[in-house]
């Protein structure tokens, strides 16, 4: 009786993108192409490239914070700061829910967890191209969520913010949301004015997508 030989050829377990993930990737490419971008990771200027890399680290910090503390965490991007308008669309912070004496999260009672960063000079968060769901493309998705005030903030950080949120398991509450930044200029005489794109910066955009599991 012949002994049956089993095929021991290792089977690759690597999985490709799911259909949903592919749709999201295509959506982000559409957004960045509309913005004049030439790549997903800011292949234009060094300022945009470094801004994307540093911001990704803040998103990872917020996600890990949410998991470790079992409390919601948010990445904030300044929309309209009361005392430092020159940092609008450039100041990025990380906040999380406070914990009570038993180590449990106090719902919607936020505290600053990181001083975050300022985007590089002449680099700004793009309200136009950052979307709540990148799979819907430039026109089909709603804007990023907003936080009208930052409770208990020091004077430097008072104002309104855009935000991306992670739940207690580190899952992004707006899966497929895109984060896009680009080069621009703002009139020195009006620091709170909306930045504008200059001719040399039309292709200088970059960004990433926040997947459902919180990774970028």
Task: Say what each PLM segment does.
Residues 27-28:
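Residues within membrane-spanning alpha-helices of integral membrane proteins
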Residues 2-7, 14-20, 34-64, 68, ...:
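N-terminal helix-rich module
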């Amino acid at each position: 009786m012949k002994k049956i030989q089993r095929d021991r050829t290792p089977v690759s377990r690597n999985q490709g993108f799911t259909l949903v993930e592919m749709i999201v990737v295509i959506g982000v490419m559409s957004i960045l192409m509309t913005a004049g971008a030439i790549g997903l990771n800011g292949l234009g200027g060094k300022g945009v490239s470094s801004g994307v890399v540093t911001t990704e680290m803040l998103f990872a910090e917020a996600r890990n914070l949410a998991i470790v503390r079992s409390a919601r965490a948010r990445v904030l991007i300044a929309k309209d700061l009361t005392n430092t308008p020159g940092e609008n669309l450039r100041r990025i912070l990380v906040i999380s829910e406070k914990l009570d004496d038993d180590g449990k999260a106090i719902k919607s009672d936020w505290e600053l967890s990181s001083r975050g960063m300022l985007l590089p000079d002449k680099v700004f968060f793009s309200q136009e191209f950052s979307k709540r769901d990148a799979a819907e493309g430039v026109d089909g998705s709603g804007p990023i969520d907003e936080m009208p005030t930052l409770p208990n903030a020091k004077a430097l950080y008072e104002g309104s913010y855009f935000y991306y949120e992670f739940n207690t398991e580190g899952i992004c509450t707006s899966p497929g949301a895109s984060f896009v930044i680009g080069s621009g200029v703002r009139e020195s005489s009006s620091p709170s004015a909306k930045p504008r794109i200059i001719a040399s910066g039309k292709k200088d955009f970059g960004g990433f997508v926040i997947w459902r599991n919180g990774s970028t």
